[in-house]
From Swiss-Prot:
It is found in: Secreted. The keyword Transport does not apply. One of its GO terms (molecular function) is nutrient reservoir activity. Larval storage protein (LSP) which may serve as a store of amino acids for synthesis of adult proteins. Binds the A.niger cell wall component alpha-1,3-glucan, a fungal pathogen-associated molecular pattern (PAMP) that activates the host immune response. It holds the Pfam family Hemocyanin_C. Residues 1-16 form the signal peptide. The keyword Hydrolase does not apply. SUPFAM superfamilies: Di-copper centre-containing domain (SSF48056), E set domains (SSF81296), Hemocyanin, N-terminal domain (SSF48050). Belongs to the hemocyanin family. Gene3D superfamilies: Di-copper center containing domain from catechol oxidase (1.10.1280.10), Hemocyanin, C-terminal domain (2.60.40.1520), Hemocyanin, N-terminal domain (1.20.1370.10). This is Arylphorin. InterPro entries: Di-copper_centre_dom_sf, Hemocyanin/hexamerin, Hemocyanin/hexamerin_mid_dom, Hemocyanin_C, Hemocyanin_C_sf, Hemocyanin_N, Hemocyanin_N_sf, Ig_E-set. The gene is LOC113516268. Keywords: Glycoprotein, Secreted, Signal, Storage protein.
């Protein structure tokens, strides 16, 4: 009987109806001058929770003295600030680190700036080795990852995917405990039992089959979305966004002249996240994103099965009363912040922090976005600001529902999903919070003049037809390396240790082509945009464009030269501007490096969404959506933005023409615009849970 169980488990794990993901890696030749830098960067991130006395970095970092090398940094002030904090005592090793914990954040920002202002890579490497040996592990990785992205001499360097660096933040604790068990036992004591527990062994690697969270974590059918909100690519996207635009750093340093659009970027990214999430809700029959009031009981519980390498994550009960206990002062601050914004809108003017802003101007979206993020550019003309007394940070703290620590380090902080950019998207409260923020920003947009027919109409250009291939989604298995979750023995550090691989089904879609038939009276260079939005709301009723403009997600943005007469454009989903392939594993990176190559999209397109998440999961009968295609004259980006062409195609606002409310829907029936009804079909299992009782008989309203 036991043998039958083992065989049944093996069959269900190895098959389960899902294909296996295969990489098709687009590579580029790595500049020979960067090869040594690339190798050293990767070496500092391997097994980062522990130090290896036999590694090069340890011997360098153990002896390096920052104070004795002050001349090796281009900004003496940041060295002085770092040393002041370092001598006072940084957070100890093995403590949970979050950028939302104030004292820890002040320290890690000082460390990042020390890295950033190292005069050359040799100094940067020595400083990083010092931090790797002596400082808190989480602070080191956070600051180092950021510095590699933003330093000029490390541009072109590939970094491992976030889920390979922090595996414990991307899988549930049941899988983590199995990995710990195998590491402690030094393998499977009875190999035949492995498949029964969801563990397979092959070629010095252990494969752990992982499920997504169920009703124990999410109530009210929210668990139907766990395959999406717990997707490692979805959560990595948000982490990359923070690394490209950390709220506490000045925009001039991060994005140069694009700083004047930082607040606009903030709005655009969160609109895209919420629009994509909303489509997935509709596909699962869950309806609208719930709204909440800070003074009422919060109804959305969350019981994460996550654990840091030291502490389990805090849980939030249903009927959680937000405005109670330690939250009273925070709720008052939040309430005042919201009311202040509405009062500013009524006045039409903001005058503070040594700046004056006309809130009825479309370019003021930059200020409005900065206001809600409370980032460094909002306060650039005034002395240093406490970013942890911001709306975002305070709201996360309240919704996280963690017990408050009375002592900064000794008592530690109980982590919540909202404390980390790697895990925030797993908590349904995240989407409800940012839906609230976007509601306020859209209040500002209501004061802007809607686009007129003259602005939207492109005279002489007509889209005759749009045809789309059959849209199909499915689940497939994907392997990712979780070895960084464990501590290796001294012997394993110096040998080829076993790899611990998590195997998990993920949403994907079949490649498709959008065929656009355009008639033009003249030869011209144009911009083509493709959007995807809902056809019906959560009740199965058609949505008017007045209510629906905010729900469209921009899929593609490209230029094209039209000739006089008929033009046919075939745009493949693999070409879509805002999407990329999944990150390859660290093993694959090393394999490519041996030939002097790196994955090109992990260098300059890491910030985009995985291509397999273009479409929401379909249904067997077809999930109805609408594609919107628009063509308009090309205006080149201003010269100052040339260095940011991987983010910008033309000179229009991000999300145009859905960057403003639609008050007259018939204005969007111009000849150069086209709405196309499409359906998304799901092949195979509707939910990635093998024989899951909890996901049976759940269908959308469409």
């Amino acid at each position: 009987m036991q043998t039958v169980l083992f065989l049944a488990a093996l069959v269900s794990l190895a098959a389960a109806g899902y294909p296996q993901y295969h990489y098709d890696v687009e590579t580029r030749k790595l500049d020979p001058s960067l090869l040594n830098i690339q190798t050293k960067v990767l070496s500092l991130l391997e097994n980062w929770k522990q130090v290896n006395p036999d590694d090069e970095y340890y011997k360098i970092g153990k002896e390096y003295n920052v104070e004795a090398n002050m001349e090796s940094y281009t900004n003496r002030e940041v060295v002085t600030e770092f040393l002041s904090l370092y001598k006072a005592g940084f957070i100890p090793k093995n403590e949970v680190f979050s950028i939302f914990y104030e004292n820890q954040a002040l320290e890690v920002i000082a460390l990042y700036r020390l890295f950033y202002y190292a005069k050359d890579f040799e100094t940067f490497y020595k400083t990083a080795a010092f931090a790797r040996v002596w400082l808190n592990e989480g602070q080191f990785v956070y600051a180092f990852y950021l510095a590699v992205i933003h330093r000029a001499d490390t541009r072109g360097i590939v970094l491992p995917a976030p889920y390979e660096i922090w595996p414990e933040y991307f899988m549930n604790s049941d899988v983590l405990s199995k990995i710990y068990r195998i590491q402690m036992q030094k393998g499977l004591i009875i190999p035949e039992q492995g498949p029964y527990y969801g563990i397979l062994s092959k070629d010095n690697a252990y494969y752990f089959y992982a499920n997504y969270s169920g009703p124990l974590t999410y109530e009210d059918n929210e668990n139907l979305l766990s395959y999406f909100i717990e997707d490692i690519g979805w959560n990595s996207y948000y982490y990359y966004f923070h690394n490209r635009f950390p709220f506490w750093e000045n925009g001039e340093q991060l994005i140069g002249p694009l700083k004047e659009r930082r607040g606009e970027i903030y709005y655009y990214v969160y609109q895209k996240i919420l629009a994509r999430y909303y489509l997935e809700r509709l596909a699962n029959g869950l309806g609208e994103i719930p709204r909440f009031n800070w003074l009422d009981k919060y109804q959305t519980s969350y019981y994460p099965l996550l654990s840091s390498y030291q502490l389990p994550f805090a849980q939030r009960n249903d009927d959680y009363y937000l405005a109670s206990g330690d939250n009273i002062n925070d709720i008052q601050f939040i309430d005042t912040y919201e009311k202040t914004f509405l009062q500013l809108l009524q006045k039409g003017q903001f005058k503070a922090y040594k700046q004056e802003v006309d809130l009825y101007n479309s370019k003021s979206i930059n200020f409005v976005g900065n206001y809600w993020q409370s980032n460094a550019d909002l306060y650039e003309k005034v002395p240093k600001r406490n970013y942890w007394r911001s709306y975002e940070a305070t709201a996360r703290r309240v919704l996280g529902a963690a017990p408050r620590s009375s002592i900064n380090y000794e008592n530690m902080n109980i982590p919540t999903a909202l404390d980390f950019y790697q895990t925030s998207l797993r908590d349904p409260a995240f989407y409800q919070l940012y839906a609230k923020i976007l509601d306020y920003i859209n209040e500002y947009k209501e004061y802007l003049e809607p686009y007129s027919q003259d602005v939207l109409h492109y005279v002489g250009v007509k889209i005759n037809d749009v045809k789309v291939d059959k849209l199909v989604t499915y689940f497939e298995y994907f392997d990712w390396n979780a070895t960084n979750a464990v501590y290796l023995s001294e012997q394993q550090l110096d040998t080829v240790s076993p790899s611990y691989i998590v195997r998990q089904p993920r949403l994907n879609n079949k490649p498709f082509t959008v065929n656009i038939d355009i008639k033009s009276d003249v030869e011209s260079e144009v911009v083509v945009k493709i959007f995807l939005g809902p056809k019906y709301d959560g009740n199965g009723l058609p949505i008017s464009l007045e209510d629906n403009w905010i729900n469209f997600i921009e899929l593609d943005w490209f230029t094209h030269k039209l000739t006089s007469g008929q033009n046919k454009i075939a745009r493949k989903s693999e070409e879509f501007f805002f999407f990329k392939d999944d990150s390859v594993s660290l093993f694959k990176i090393y394999e490519l490096l041996s030939n002097g190559q790196v994955p090109s999209y992990m260098v300059d397109r890491y910030i985009y969404l995985p291509r397999r998440l273009i479409l929401p999961r379909g249904t067997q009968r077809g999930f109805p959506l609408q594609l919107f295609v628009v063509v308009y004259p090309y205006q080149a980006p201003v010269k100052e933005w040339e260095s940011m062409r991987q983010y910008i195609v033309d000179n229009k606002p991000f999300g145009y023409p859905f960057d403003r409310p639609v008050t007259l829907p018939y204005y969007f029936n111009q000849p150069n615009m086209y709405f196309k009804d499409v359906y998304v079909y799901q092949e195979g299992e509707q939910y990635p849970y093998y024989n899951s009782y909890w996901s049976q008989n759940q269908v959308s309203n469409h």
